[in-house]
Amino acid sequence: MSEEVMAIFKAAGAILEGHFLLTSGLHSPVYWEKFRVLQHPHYTERLCGFIADHYRRSEVQVVAGPTTGGIIIAFEVARQLGVRSIFAEKEGGKRVFRRGFTLESGERVLVVDDVLTTGSSISEVMEAVARLGGIVIGVAVLVNRAEQDKQFGVPLFNCLRTVTPTYTPSDCPLCAAGIPLTRPGSEAER
C-alpha cells in the first residue's frame, strides 16, 4: 500500500521541496501538498478506501475531520462506510462542531485528517467529539510525517508513514542558510 500511496502523491506533484512554514508553526524542507491529490476524485477515492477498508469492521457510526482537508477525507471515508461525516472548525482557540452537527452520547467516531505532523488538529477534533459525548474509536491519516510516534489513546492508521524533518524557527538550518521561507496556501501564493 505504501508504494501505491507514494506513487499517487508523486503523480499528483504533491511532494514539494524547499523551505516551508507548516500550519504547526514548524519549518520543513518537504511539504506534502495534499490538495494536489485531493483535487482528483479517483486518487481521493483510492486513498480513503484504504482507511475505510481498515476500519470497516469497527462499527464506525460517524467520520469526523478538521477543516479544511479533513472535510474531504471525512466525507469520502464516510461515503465508503455508509455513515455520516462531520467536521470541526476553529472557534475561540479550539475546534467545535457547528452548522448543526451533533453526536449522540456514545456514538462511535473515526477521526481522520490529511497529514499528521504534530497531531494538534486530531487532538482538537477528539476533544470536540468528547465534548458532545461521542467515543473516538480510531484515528486515520493519509500521510503520517511525524518525527516521533504519536499516541492518541486509540488505534492510528496511516496510508503512508514517512519521517520528514521539521524544525522550530529558532533551530532551522534552512533559515540559517538564508533559504526563503514559503507559506503554502497563504495569501502570498494566490
List where the protein language model places each region:
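Short glycine-rich phosphate-binding loop at a beta-alpha junction
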Residues: S58-T67
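Residue-level preference for short coil/turn positions at secondary-structure junctions
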Residues: E59, E104-G106, F152, T168
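A contiguous pocket-lining binding segment that forms or flanks enzyme active sites
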Residues: L103-A140
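Short, glycine/charge-rich flexible loops or terminal/linker lids adjacent to PRPP-binding catalytic cores
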Residues: I73-L110, T118-S120, L174
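Hydrophobic/aromatic beta-strand patches that form the interior of the parallel beta-sheet core
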Residues: A64, I86, L110, I137-A140, ...
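PRPP-dependent phosphoribosyltransferase catalytic core
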Residues: S2-I8, M126-R190
